[in-house]
Every structure is written in C-alpha cells, then in structure tokens.
Amino acid sequence: MRVYKTYIQQLSFDGIAYKKGEVADLQKRFRIVCSSFPFKRNPEAKDLPSRDWAGEDGRDIYIPEKIPMKNYEIEAVFVYKGTEGTISSDISDFVDFLYGRNENAVGGRLAVYDEYVGMGRKDVHVLSVDNDVYECSDADPDAIAEFKVKFAVEDPVTEIIPEYVSLSGVNAVRDLRFNI
C-alpha cells in the first residue's frame, strides 16, 4: 500500500523574488500525515466591475481576457501518531512551523503539495489551528491525534510541481517549483 505524503515549504517574498526554505516531509519531520487537504482545482471567479443603468437592458460589464480568481479558505485534517511523551512537543513544533515561528524559519508564507490530491498551491498561510487536538487511550502505548488547520490560499491558480530526487532508492521531494 502506498503512503501519500504532504510536503510544505516555507517561503518569503520581497516583491521581486521568493526565498525558499527546506521542503518538509510532514510524516518524516513531525510524524504527521494529512488525511484531507481539499484544494480547489477550479476556484471561484472574482466579481467583475459593472454598471447597471436603470434605463437600459442588462449591464455594462468589463470582461477581461483572463477572468481573475478569488482566494479561498480550506480546512485540512492532520493525523499524528507518536507517543504520549512526544505528542505535545511534536504538534507544537508543527504548528510553529506552519506559522513561521520555528527556529531558522524563512517565513509564514507556504507552498503546499499533497500527493494524494496530486496538486498544491503557493502563497498559503495559516488562519487557525483547532484547539481540540488529541486523544490518548490508556490501553494503547501510541498517542494518536487528529486536528484541523484552517488555511487561506491567496494564489488560487499557480500550480506546484514537486521536484523529486532519489536517495538510496527512495524518492524524496527536494523542491516545490512554481512559475511566477
């Protein structure tokens, strides 16, 4: 059975160029997998400028060659599996990473790619993290947590293309590429 991974890369943008951090394999770095990252393949169009004249049929509307798309919000579901001794620090490290508050952070702007969905977006940022974080069972030595994170996708159209590299026969993502 194939395990589909989610990759996140911290970004910063100075108005001219992007600075990129390392690509984080969530499973390897934080012991977290994503069970749902519902990117929109076809986002909603922005409202176009128009005038509605009372004495005329229809409206005057400006229709550009490419209709611009709206940003949108999504709620992703993450699952953690570790031990009771590490659950708090692992999830805190993950949340700090998402907010760009970790050590050596590049920024809170993110590029995200989900292998299961087969797509990703850039200029993603966190809006909130669910406070109902985890559930531990006394009978199970593993700590399992499910929690939700709300993201804003500010660039709803730029495709992310993962750049894979083979390390000892195992594919890993080296960079999340996109055109600007």
What is each residue range found by the language model?
Residues M1-I180:
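Extracellular/virion structural assembly segments
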